[in-house]
């Protein structure tokens, strides 16, 4: 027979464990960090190389309060190849587009980015708080192609089929034994040589941009100096990358608090000229500006990227030829076939 003291002891132990769970559970739950991602405009409205989007991250505790003293490492990867038709920038497919570390301000951080191609992007976010808490989230989202491009492709496809149809009827009228149609599509992409400008510096701010090549990350860095030495004071930095030919902002951070320096790994998506500007507001010195114009080295896309489209267009013309020839023979009297 069990002792009453044994039963009381076990019951007390169960009550103690239950109370401990209620007391310490909030503390354990408080260790969690929530990561939220938002774009403006909404993802459904974004299109490749149309307008830059505002990308924002919000980091909160489990109770919804913003986390102030923390940094986030952000990595953005381009869509992988896989569609029948390649994108406008096949070299960019499956590569890393951007990587940087940002400091939270009231639990938030935001930046501008112009998505270069259609497809499924992957954004990896690693959060590290000052008290040691960490969180990692991966956001996968899709950017749709411009509707006007699909309409243009459809119209061009119809035009090729009609061209083949007309050619089939013309060649059949001459009663030739065979008709050979050759479609030669040559796409020449001239890679512009990259000229690496020497870093420009003023009395306190220094902007540096590594030589840029399509398909590879280039380091963009800005740091504050005092008499040639690093100055760790906190400033608000605005960094902007602009596509000069299209006049569009492809990347920007605005009034980002930094401790004397900032760096990002950024891929310039095409072989064109870009302007990189940096502006910082310093308490006792006022605004500081820096600017560089760089030429990005383009790379000729592999033949396999254009092969599906080439075969598709040739197939349309061949189908039109066959249908045109068949319709002409079908309409002719039996003695003239």
Regions found by a protein language model. Give the residues of each.
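Bacterial N-terminal signal peptides
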Residues: 13-25, 184-186
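N-terminal soluble domains immediately following signal/targeting peptides that reside
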Residues: 29-182, 188-336
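Selective for proline/serine-rich intrinsically disordered segments
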Residues: 1-5, 24, 39, 195
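Bacterial N-terminal signal peptides that target proteins for export
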Residues: 3-16
């Amino acid at each position: 027979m069990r002792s009453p003291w044994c039963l009381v002891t076990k019951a007390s132990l169960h009550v103690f464990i239950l109370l401990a769970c209620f007391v310490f559970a909030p503390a354990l739950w408080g260790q969690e960090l929530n990561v939220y991602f938002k774009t403006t405009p909404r993802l459904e409205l974004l299109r490749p190389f149309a307008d830059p989007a505002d990308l924002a991250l919000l980091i909160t505790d489990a109770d919804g309060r913003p986390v102030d003293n923390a940094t986030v490492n952000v990595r953005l990867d381009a869509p992988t190849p896989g569609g029948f038709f390649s994108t406008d920038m096949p070299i960019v497919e499956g590569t890393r587009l951007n990587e940087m570390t940002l400091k939270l301000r009231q639990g938030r951080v935001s930046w501008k980015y112009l998505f270069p191609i259609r497809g499924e992007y992957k954004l990896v976010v690693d959060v590290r708080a000052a008290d040691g808490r960490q969180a990692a989230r991966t956001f996968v989202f899709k950017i749709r192609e411009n509707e006007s491009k699909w309409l243009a492709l459809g119209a061009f496809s119809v035009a090729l089929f009609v061209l083949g149809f007309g050619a089939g009827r013309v060649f059949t009228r001459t009663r030739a034994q065979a008709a050979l149609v050759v479609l030669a599509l040559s796409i020449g992409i001239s890679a512009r040589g990259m000229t690496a400008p020497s870093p420009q510096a003023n009395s306190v701010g220094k902007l540096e941009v590594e030589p840029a090549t399509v398909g590879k990350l280039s380091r963009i860095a800005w740091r504050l100096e005092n008499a040639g030495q690093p100055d760790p004071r906190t400033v608000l930095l605005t960094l902007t990358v602009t596509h000069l030919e299209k006049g569009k902002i492809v990347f920007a951070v605005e009034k980002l608090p930094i401790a004397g320096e900032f760096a990002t790994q950024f891929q310039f998506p095409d072989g064109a000229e870009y302007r990189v500007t940096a502006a910082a507001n310093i308490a006792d010195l006022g605004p500081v500006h820096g600017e560089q114009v760089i030429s990005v080295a383009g790379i000729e896309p592999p033949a396999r990227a254009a092969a599906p489209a080439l075969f598709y267009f040739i197939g349309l013309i061949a189908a039109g030829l066959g249908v045109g020839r068949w319709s002409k023979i079908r309409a002719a009297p039996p003695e003239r076939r």
